[in-house]
């Protein structure tokens, strides 16, 4: 899609507010399509929660490693036409410090995902190239390019086929989480009654780690395609060219869907650990939700006043569900005319995905150093924004002689 982890499409309940919980804001949430109310079109710049977490963390990291003389430069001086020499010095300094981030002993989980869940796109991005993910965390991701915007717009278009977005004012993190979980509950109910939903947010506890993911599409299996009664998980990826991507990209897509199934099945079979949820995310279980949020919950047909009551609804909703279908579906679509390039069906491989999951978590917990992409896959370096400064790049040259990297998404979505 987009985890991430994410990984990236917008989640079906995308926060568009200030990150300060004390301030009020609005949250966009999805609900099943209604033909009785017409909402005006609002232009939206899609940035998923997982991507915002990466950007926020990268900003914090850059502040922590910049020397005091650079930190003391007034932002107003720079934006108002400050010295080009100062701006160049910051750029050169960031290039020289490309490896400084990994020298800090604190784990990436603690530094960049404190009180946050790891996104599925965090995990798939790490599998793509650990060194690239390390640099993305420490120094930030390049701006969304045209191809990525087209892909994001297509995901939004697909989502709007089955859900509509409404805005609800929020006043705290408890309000935000209540609406996120409510949106998941609504998505599951839509699947149960209509056989299909899109952009379904999942939050679960897998192998000692909180994981969040947004399933692109979820539908009931047709009788002719599977004897398994569980829902089929689907991910649609858009392509600039009407050809299939290389095997490492297809592998990454398969991993993404298997991680969604792992997350779904874990919630269904093992339940939702409510106590650890409130503790890890620093939430007040007895918090009385704001009036606007309570009104929206009531409109959804749920009687709840506190965050804990919504969490219980989320837990009980998934306890009624079957595990996901063992067959998964990865679709590739041509951006130009939205024609289907290929539909790849494959079976879930629990041992393989758990092996990959443990390997990736080791990186996030700093149990080992970040590895470079395998030698046979180092063609990826041609599309990496950090290639000029990365020793793993086969064409690595000194900054004075290297040529610009090619424009392409740094991580698979």
Swiss-Prot record:
Q: What is its EC number?
A: 3.1.-.-
**Composition bias type Low complexity, residue spans:** 1-19, 394-406
Q: Which UniProt keywords apply?
A: 4Fe-4S, Chloroplast, DNA-binding, Exonuclease, Hydrolase, Iron, Iron-sulfur, Magnesium, Metal-binding, Nuclease, Plastid, Transit peptide
What does the Swiss-Prot or TrEMBL cofactor note state?
A: Binds 1 [4Fe-4S] cluster.
- Keyword Lipid biosynthesis in record: no
GO MF annotation list: 4 iron, 4 sulfur cluster binding; DNA binding; metal ion binding; single-stranded DNA 5'-3' DNA exonuclease activity
Q: Which cofactor does it need?
A: [4Fe-4S] cluster; Mg(2+)
Q: What class of enzyme is it?
A: hydrolase
According to the UniProt record, where is the region Disordered?
1-32, 389-413
Against InterPro entries, the record matches this protein to: EXOV, PDDEXK-like_dom_sf
Q: Name one Pfam family in it.
A: Exo5
Specify the superkingdom. Answer: Eukaryota
- Binding of [4Fe-4S] cluster, residues: 129, 381, 384, 390
> What residues does the transit peptide encompass?
1-47
Q: Where is the composition biased (Polar residues)?
A: 20-32
Q: List cellular component terms (GO).
A: chloroplast
Protein family: Belongs to the EXO5 family.
Q: What does this protein do?
A: Single-stranded DNA (ssDNA) bidirectional exonuclease. Has both 5'-3' and 3'-5' exonuclease activities with a strong preference for 5'-ends.
PANTHER family, from UniProt? EXONUCLEASE V
The name this protein carries in UniProt is Exonuclease V, chloroplastic
- What's the source species for this entry? Arabidopsis thaliana
């Amino acid at each position: 899609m987009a985890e991430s982890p994410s990984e990236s499409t917008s989640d079906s309940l995308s926060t568009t507010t200030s990150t300060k919980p004390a301030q009020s804001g609005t949250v966009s949430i999805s609900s099943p399509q209604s033909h009785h109310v017409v909402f005006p079109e609002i232009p939206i710049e899609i940035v998923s929660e997982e991507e915002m977490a990466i950007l926020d963390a990268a900003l914090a990291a850059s502040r922590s490693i910049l020397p005091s003389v650079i930190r003391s430069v007034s932002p107003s001086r720079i934006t108002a036409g400050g010295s080009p020499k100062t701006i160049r010095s910051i750029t050169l300094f960031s290039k020289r410090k490309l490896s400084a981030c990994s020298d800090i002993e604190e784990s990436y989980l603690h530094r960049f995902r404190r009180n946050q869940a790891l996104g599925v796109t965090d995990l798939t991005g790490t599998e793509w190239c650990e060194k690239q993910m390390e640099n993305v965390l420490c120094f930030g991701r390049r701006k969304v390019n045209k191809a990525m915007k087209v892909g994001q717009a297509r995901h939004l278009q697909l989502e709007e086929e089955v859900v509509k977005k409404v805005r609800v004012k929020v006043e705290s993190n408890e309000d935000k989480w209540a609406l996120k979980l409510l949106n998941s509950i609504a998505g599951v109910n839509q699947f149960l009654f209509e056989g299909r939903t899109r952009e379904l947010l999942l939050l679960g506890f897998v192998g000692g780690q909180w994981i969040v993911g947004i399933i692109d599409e979820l539908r009931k299996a047709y009788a002719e395609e599977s004897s398994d009664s569980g829902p089929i998980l689907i991910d649609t990826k858009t392509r600039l060219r009407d050809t299939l991507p290389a095997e490492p990209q297809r592998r990454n897509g398969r991993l993404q869907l298997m991680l969604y199934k792992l997350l779904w099945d874990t919630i269904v079979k093992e339940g939702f650990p409510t106590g650890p949820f409130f503790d890890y995310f620093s939430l007040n279980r007895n918090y009385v939700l704001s009036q606007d949020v309570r009104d929206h919950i009531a409109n959804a047909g749920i009687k709840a006043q506190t965050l804990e009551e919504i969490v219980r609804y989320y837990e009980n909703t998934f306890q009624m569900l079957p595990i996901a279908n063992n067959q998964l579906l990865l679709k590739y679509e041509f951006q130009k005319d939205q024609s289907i390039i290929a539909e790849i069906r494959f079976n879930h491989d629990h041992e393989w995905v758990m092996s990959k999951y443990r390997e990736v978590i080791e990186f996030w917990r700093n149990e080992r150093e970040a590895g470079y992409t395998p030698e046979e896959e180092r063609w990826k370096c041609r599309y990496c924004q950090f290639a000029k400064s990365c020793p793993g790049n086969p064409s690595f040259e000194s900054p004075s002689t290297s040529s610009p990297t090619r424009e392409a998404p740094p991580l698979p979505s």
